[in-house]
Amino acid sequence: MDRAPRISFTSLGCPKALVDSERIITRLRAEGYELARKHDGADIVIVNTCGFLDSAKQESLSAIGEAMAENGKVIVTGCMGAEPEQIEQAYPGVLSITGPQQYESVLDAVHRALPPAHNPHLDLVPPQGIKLTPRHYAYLKISEGCNNRCTFCIIPKLRGDLVSRPANDVLREAERLVGAGVKELLVISQDTSAYGVDLKYAESPWKDRQVRAKFLDLARELGELGAWVRLQYVYPYPHVDEVIALMTQGTVLPYLDIPFQHASPEVLKAMKRPAAQDKTLARIKRWREECPDLALRSTFIVGFPGETDADFAYLLDWLDEAEIDRLGCFKYEPVAGATSNAIANPVPEEVKQERYNALMARQQKISARRLKRKVGTRQQIIIDEVGPTVARGRSKADAPEIDGAVYLSSRRPLRVGEIVTAKIERADQYDLHGSVAGF
């Protein structure tokens, strides 16, 4: 082969999987492989799959099928690869199937099918690695796996128990990213607030001090690097209360992504989730008293087996009181291997849809009410996209792709990644509108 070997890559699923894809691509680029924009222009295709829900598995199978049709040489990795039988049955011609985080196995499969053109040269890639996100923000994965055993979830089966990175390893990566121009670090894992439990909060050397592998300590150190720090996938352990002070001080963004999943004590017990939602409401109230700018994002499941009309009504009432700023909702799907499949009294599909519609309608009103309070205020906005007359950005209350946006007019040209102060002039159900202040 006279040219460098070319790889096409499809990455599906959550931000954790996206980080896995970035690591694989970084290693391949260091070995001289080039990235092709289309499958039919590549020598081989890698598909990083999602296997959490049946709908995600179908999307993964469709992506594998497209790669097989357009190229024919396909390596499959990711969460669905942890249970390869369905892939093998549908596409027996794939070259290799591996589970999540098996970077070396993916590289070995690539080497067997498409040897590198030359010896590795690490200077082919920037020191912070290859990123699949825009230049101004990056996902920072601090651990793998999860020690919780929620009945609807098979992530521990796919990704194993919690394995945290040493604090100095995380901080070195974060510092490289900020040095390369990243303005926002999105801290992710399966269970961000459990960070360091497996390490027994061991210290590691960083700069002129020792830093514990602990949620609060890591958040504090990340906040000293000069970028926005956004905490996502936070399980509501009691020690989460401690990080609110960092938000009040401006060390990290006043934003918490906590997947509460439900509010009814009976449903939460069936899910094996924290069930004292009356105490959670009291905590939310304290958090907002301490940090009035705090934005809360959460996800909820409707139609969980055994969920009654009373359980769902309890959830709606709880949402009215909690006033979650940003909300995602899923209709329950039975997942192969999940213990929730054995719970009695499954909810009919039409009832799931009715409850989904009702919850999202309720949340739309809550969101509109909370956003309306921001009209007339000044907010810091990070610019994601620049158009001819209007730029699209996000406030500190908005994570990329999953939350709302802020649409801005400006008398001067704006740049992607720039952080500006804007006056908020109008709000709708999910988004804000305004203009860059001072011009």
Curated annotation (Swiss-Prot):
* Known cofactor(s): [4Fe-4S] cluster
The top EC class, named as a word, is: transferase
Main localization, broad class: cytoplasm
Please provide the Gene Ontology terms (biological process) for this protein: tRNA modification
Reaction(s) this enzyme catalyzes, per UniProt:
L-aspartate(89)-[ribosomal protein uS12]-hydrogen + (sulfur carrier)-SH + AH2 + 2 S-adenosyl-L-methionine = 3-methylsulfanyl-L-aspartate(89)-[ribosomal protein uS12]-hydrogen + (sulfur carrier)-H + 5'-deoxyadenosine + L-methionine + A + S-adenosyl-L-homocysteine + 2 H(+)
General function of this protein: Catalyzes the methylthiolation of an aspartic acid residue of ribosomal protein uS12.
- Name one molecular function that GO assigns to this entry: 4 iron, 4 sulfur cluster binding
Q: How is the cofactor bound?
A: Binds 2 [4Fe-4S] clusters. One cluster is coordinated with 3 cysteines and an exchangeable S-adenosyl-L-methionine.
Q: Which key words tag this protein in UniProt? A: 4Fe-4S, Cytoplasm, Iron, Iron-sulfur, Metal-binding, S-adenosyl-L-methionine, Transferase
Q: Does the keyword Repressor apply?
A: no
Coiled-coil spans are none
Q: Which residues form the MTTase N-terminal domain?
A: 5-115
Sorted alphabetically, which PROSITE patterns does this protein's record hold?
MTTASE_N, MTTASE_RADICAL, RADICAL_SAM, TRAM
According to the entry, every stretch annotated as the TRAM domain falls at 372-438
Q: Which GO terms describe its cellular component?
A: cytosol
Q: Where does [4Fe-4S] cluster 1 bind?
A: 14, 50, 79
Protein name per the record: Ribosomal protein uS12 methylthiotransferase RimO
What the entry lists under Pfam families is as follows: Radical_SAM, TRAM_2, UPF0004
Where along this sequence does the record place binding of [4Fe-4S] cluster 2? 146, 150, 153
Q: Which InterPro entries match?
A: Elp3/MiaA/NifB-like_rSAM (IPR006638), Methylthiotransferase (IPR005839), Methylthiotransferase_CS (IPR020612), Methylthiotransferase_N (IPR013848), Methylthiotransferase_N_sf (IPR038135), NA-bd_OB-fold (IPR012340), Ribosomal_uS12_MeSTrfase_RimO (IPR005840), rSAM (IPR007197)
Q: What is its EC number?
A: 2.8.4.4
Q: Where in the cell is it found?
A: Cytoplasm
Which source organism does the UniProt entry give? Bradyrhizobium diazoefficiens (strain JCM 10833 / BCRC 13528 / IAM 13628 / NBRC 14792 / USDA 110)
Q: What family does the database annotate?
A: Belongs to the methylthiotransferase family. RimO subfamily.
Q: Which residues form the Radical SAM core domain?
A: 132-369
